[in-house]
């Protein structure tokens, strides 16, 4: 066996020996969450967009094991002002605080806060600027949902 092949196989053997299991495998953490999480009902457009992405990634459920509570905050920052004093670019900053409750035990299984941002340009028309802002909101909620799911899979104390 060549040295290259040996160096390629060695890490795989080490991973299996230490009890490594893929998070999306049959015994992985992500499997416990799939179609088992009920996201609280959204109250705002951002809440709807975040809930939609979470349900797309985790699946919708009729008999949930977990409840996911969310609090979303967003702020708008000015990034660029032209010589006339008009704002040309905005930064949309968002954060989501989440709490995952196990309905069977009543315990908080995971909680945390995720932050991210996205930007958009203010063009010459109001309609185009509003469309860009709505697209930025959608992108931001997708990013926050993906961060929440990543954190849940990585840190939640979930039953196997």
Q: Where do the PLM segments sit?
A:
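Bacterial signal peptide processing site
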Residues: 19-22
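Surface-exposed short loop/turn segments
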Residues: 64-113, 117-135, 142, 146
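Post-signal peptide N-terminal segment of mature Sec-exported envelope proteins
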Residues: 28-51
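Sec-exported extracytoplasmic/periplasmic mature domains
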Residues: 55, 59, 145, 149-157
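Amphipathic, coiled-coil-like alpha-helical scaffolding segments used for oligomerization/assembly
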Residues: 136, 140, 151-160
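C-terminal motif of bacterial Sec signal peptides marking the signal peptidase cleavage site
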Residues: 14-17
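Bacterial N-terminal signal peptides that target proteins for export
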Residues: 1-7
